[in-house]
Amino acid sequence: DQHNAHERVLYEKKYAEYRQQEILTQGLLVPVNIEVTLAEKKIIEKHFDLLNKLGIKIESFGSNSYIVTELPLLLKNLPGQVIVREIIDRLLENDRKLQPADLIDDLITLMSCKAAIKAGKYLDMREMIELVAELFNTENPERCPHGRPIIIHISNEDIARSMGR
């Protein structure tokens, strides 16, 4: 599954960047304005340092809004407001359930999933070879960060049976 494979590759790269505090970011030409509720404001304030370490640069902009000025390069092709909203929602949902390390893992998984190539997207031969090579350089090429299989074994018997033999 090309989406799961790319997600695994991105996840391991981003997690390594996070551990080394080297997440690449891109400044936004037009900062994204986000209106927040009181609960969202509290969760942003609580996890402000974590958001910065993940490459999400956010600044207070009035009493109930923030502006996002930088995002991880990983997310450059995604709508900033949508992804930041999803991250805030994930923080609200998991803040009390997850330990800090698990919360970081969850957010890196979310960002990797959103940035990964989509299932069914056409890849030329060079892209396929590159993706497979990157996948086999990961620590866990069998499963995506969500736990879904990337590679499955299909025996000759399974193929023959599906062909009515």
Predicted regions and their residues:
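Long, charged low-complexity intrinsically disordered regions
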Residues: 1-165
